[in-house]
A protein has these predicted regions:
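Class I S-adenosyl-L-methionine
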Residues: 73-78, 88-296
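Core alpha/beta nucleotide-donor-binding catalytic domains of modification enzymes
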Residues: 2-119, 129-133, 137-143
Length: 298
């Protein structure tokens, strides 16, 4: 059994990936990974994790407060952990909106601190594409700081550092109906002297990428601030069948109550258009001046 710790767990996306596999187009549980505990500070996300994984110990706590003594007080051993997984908050690294080198951008240091006393054989660190392009306080690449911090843990005493391998992966290449790039850092503890090589399932191509239609064409159309609880048809694609599983009732199909201003913006946007197109229409007098967008839209 491989012992795993999930940091910055959110609702449990990474845990799901390690606890499940796909057989005959169905998600089935796998028994070779044991999630010893998960950590999440956001209450709603922690509650969602508890609902999704009731058998996993959830530590709802600021990660800065977690150390060996804290875990021991909770009856949790920090010894003989094989793998740490997690992706620190990504808002600061995101390419959408204003990017700031703030406290959230430095949360990888807490991840590193946890590594120093748990000393897993390996870690998986996931984050957004912006991690590769964001600058630190000295205007250098933040990714260099992150990798170097994992390479050398000598400031924590005798803790062994990690050889770090980096790769940019796009979810659309692996069966997800979303053009979503993510940076993965894999760390192997140096004393193990293991060379890591990236291996993946066969990538999808333009001919077999899963489209938005493939994913949601079985869902009813919603108006503003509306909810519907029935699928409009049987699954039309393998992807829909996989995600639906044995569920017959449609859950959480609810539209937001968008204000009139945002509705006007959405109605004005054509396929592939964004903030610059809206602003151009404002400047050309096609749209009202109050629709001009300053940040947060791409």
């Amino acid at each position: 059994m491989i012992e795993v710790v999930d940091l910055f767990s959110g609702a449990g996306g990474l845990t799901f990936g390690f606890q499940n596999t796909i057989k005959n187009n169905k998600f089935v549980s796998r028994n070779d990974f044991n999630i010893r505990f998960a950590n999440e500070f956001n209450h709603d996300a922690a509650e969602a994790f508890r609902q999704n994984y009731p058998r996993v110990t959830m530590i709802e706590e600021d990660i800065a407060n977690i150390d060996e003594h804290f875990l021991k007080s909770k009856g949790i051993s920090s010894k003989r952990v094989d793998l740490v997984i997690g992706g620190p908050p990504c808002q600061s690294f995101s390419t959408v909106g204003k990017r700031q080198y703030d406290k959230r951008a430095k949360m990888y240091r807490e991840y590193r601190r946890i590594l120093s006393f748990i000393q897993p054989k390996m870690f998986v660190f996931e984050n957004v594409y912006g991690l590769l392009t964001m600058k630190n306080e000295q205007n250098g690449p933040i990714i260099r700081n992150v990798k170097e911090s994992f390479n050398d843990l000598s400031s924590f005493g005798e803790a062994s550092g990690y050889d770090v391998y980096t790769k940019l992966i796009n979810a659309k290449d692996f069966g997800v109906p979303q053009n979503r790039e993510r940076v993965f850092l894999i760390g192997i503890r140096k004393d193990l002297k293991i060379k890591f090589e990236w291996t993946f399932p066969e990538e999808t191509t333009l001919n077999n990428e899963i489209t938005l239609r493939d994913a949601i064409s079985d869902l009813p159309i919603l108006g503003n601030n509306e909810q519907k609880n029935n699928y409009i048809c049987e699954p039309r694609t393998e992807y829909q069948a996989l995600l639906r599983g044995n569920q017959t009732e449609l859950l959480n199909h609810v539209s937001r109550n968008h204000g009139e201003r945002l509705q006007k913006i959405m109605r004005a946007l054509g396929e592939g258009q964004g903030k610059n197109d809206i602003n151009r229409m404002v400047e050309d007098g096609i749209l009202d001046k109050d629709l001009y967008l300053t940040s947060g839209y791409n």
